[in-house]
Amino acid sequence: MAGRRYPIIAAALMMVIGVVSTVAADGGGIASLAAPATCWEQAARRYQVNPYLLVAIAEVESGLRPGAIGRNTNGSIDIGLMQINSLWLPELQRHGIAPRDLLDPCVSVHVGAWVLAQKMRLHGNTWTAVGAYNAGSAVLRERYARKVIEALARREQR
């Protein structure tokens, strides 16, 4: 099964490289999104994640809606542009971030980048890490990563 995943990962990686090249060539492409371009860029730089990957995650998570609230079957709540899960709140509150702060697009982008960086430290710079941003099980991680890849592809076509 592991051998089967490499072509998928290679194709997805080429797609991301194409998206980054295309967006960089058209002047950045993230300036008109739900948060100012500087928020995406600063968060990406601070947590060493790709800003276009952050945008794709936000698109999948909230449809780029800063005020989005999602309720989960386990009783947790997802808050804001990056749909930060309420299970993160105890840790965030230790850093002075309250639930209402997550409705601020810039705060949400920074926290989302921090969460993604945590997942990348755990799983490496992989699609598994991207999937872990949203899901715990391997099957759901893979499904979520595919959605993010599709969001990146849609952005490339714009």
Locations of the language-model features?
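Catalytic glycan-binding domains that act on GlcNAc-containing polysaccharides
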Residues: 26-158
